[in-house]
Structure formats: structure tokens, C-alpha cells
Design a protein with these regions (language model features):
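Polar/acidic, low-complexity leader/linker segments enriched in S/T/G and N/D
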Residues: 1-66, 180-185, 189-194, 199-202
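Residue microenvironments linked to proteolytic maturation
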Residues: 8, 71, 90-189
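A structural signal for short, hydrophobic beta-strand segments that form beta-sheets
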Residues: 9-20, 35, 81-93, 153, ...
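Short, flexible beta-strand-to-coil junctions
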Residues: 35-41, 75-78, 131-137
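Acidic Ser/Thr/Pro-rich low-complexity disordered segments
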Residues: 45-49, 77-85
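Short conserved beta-strand and strand-loop elements enriched in small hydrophobics
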Residues: 62, 66-82, 128
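Intrinsically disordered, low-complexity regulatory segments
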Residues: 205-206
Length: 206
């Protein structure tokens, strides 16, 4: 089976109190929330078996988190390699809560990280996206594509306009945790945010 780049988004929920505390202390800016979910069909029609996600999260912890190089980018990377020029954050911890993979993420003082920090501080809803290489196989019973054993987790990236509608980061006091489709004309507001981010990143690269 041919391996390909697999990108999926999940709702990432963090407390506004955590953001306010990080801003007031002036120390590391940390957010915490769900990074990925096992065993359930997502909005892209894919299922991640828990044993595969557990294996990959353990490898990610040993090979990247413990060595402090679990880096991620801002926006929608389309590469199997993390581009250091676009790095915005570093995952510092992962743990399981049932079928949910929970993570703590430190926003870094890089150009992209500073943009990410200001978006959080301004209350902008953001999404989290997992990036990996692997193959999928049709699961006829679930009417979904099941991620196969050759899957390899690469990174978690923050996105402004996720490919999965509803996969946004938002304070807990604004909305309950849901993975679904946002049927709201205000979506255009978030698309405008994405355009702004792309413009800023374009200026940084040039």
C-alpha cells in the first residue's frame, strides 16, 4: 500500500485562565488540550485505531518530546518534514484520557510563535492538526478509511481554518468540546484570519 501524507484536525480546547496566567507571568506560554482522538471516524472520514496512536504517541514522546524537539508549524504544512523557519511551538507532554490524546504545548518566541501567541491573547479560535505518513484501507463496516499499521506521526500544527470544520481551539467558557461542522456565516471571519497569517508568514519568508 502506498504511504502518503495524512493530515487531520481535532478540536483543541484550552482554558482562557491558562492563557491569562501565561501572559501575566511572562514565562513559557503553555496551552493544553486534545491533540488527536482514537477509534472514532473524524470529519475527513478516517479512523485512527487506538493501538496505532498509542504506539506512535509513545515513540513521539521518547524520540521527540524527551529530546525537546517535538516541533510544529503555524498554518497548513504540506511536507513530511518540519520546516524550522516556520516553527511556532513545541509539544512538551502527551498523555491519554480514554480515547483522547491530550497534550501540553509551549508556544515559542519565534516569528511564527509570536503570531500564534498574539492570536491566543486576542481570543482567536485556532485548530490543531496532526501530520503523519502512512496508508489507509477502507473499513466497510464503519464506512471510513482506517489508518494502517505503517502510520508514522510527524508533528502537530496549529491551523486557522482547519480542513475539518469545527476543529478550532477556543476557551472552555465559550463553547463545549465538540468535533463537528461549523454551520455559521462567521466562518468567513476565520478565513480572513488565515489570509492575514499567510500574508505575515510570506513577508517573514521574503
Amino acid at each position: 500500500m502506498e504511504r502518503k501524507l495524512i493530515v487531520d484536525c481535532i478540536t483543541f480546547d484550552t482554558s482562557k485562565d491558562v492563557i491569562n496566567e501565561a501572559m501575566s507571568k511572562g514565562g513559557p506560554f503553555i496551552v493544553k488540550g486534545i491533540l488527536q482522538r482514537a477509534g472514532a471516524k473524524n470529519q475527513n472520514g478516517r479512523i485512527y485505531p487506538k493501538e496505532i496512536l498509542e504506539r506512535e504517541s509513545n515513540k513521539y514522546n521518547e524520540n521527540f518530546i524527551k529530546e525537546r524537539r517535538a516541533l510544529g508549524e503555524l498554518d497548513h504544512p504540506e511536507s513530511s518534514v518540519v520546516n524550522l523557519k516556520n516553527v511556532s511551538h513545541n509539544v512538551t507532554k502527551v498523555m491519554w484520557d480514554g480515547d483522547d490524546l491530550i497534550g501540553e504545548v509551549e508556544v515559542l518566541p519565534t516569528p511564527s510563535g509570536n503570531i500564534l501567541k498574539e492570536l491566543f491573547a486576542s481570543g482567536i479560535r485556532l485548530g490543531i492538526s496532526s501530520r503523519g505518513m502512512g496508508s489507509v484501507k477502507k473499513n466497510v463496516y464503519e464506512s471510513a478509511d482506517e489508518v494502517q499499521d505503517d502510520f508514522e506521526l510527524i508533528a502537530f500544527d496549529f491551523v486557522s481554518n482547519p480542513s475539518t470544520r469545527g476543529a478550532f481551539l477556543y476557551p472552555k467558557d465559550q463553547q463545549s468540546l465538540q468535533e463537528g461542522i461549523v454551520k455559521n456565516p462567521e466562518t468567513n471571519k476565520w478565513e480572513n484570519v488565515e489570509n492575514i497569517i499567510r500574508d505575515i508568514l510570506g513577508e517573514i519568508k521574503s
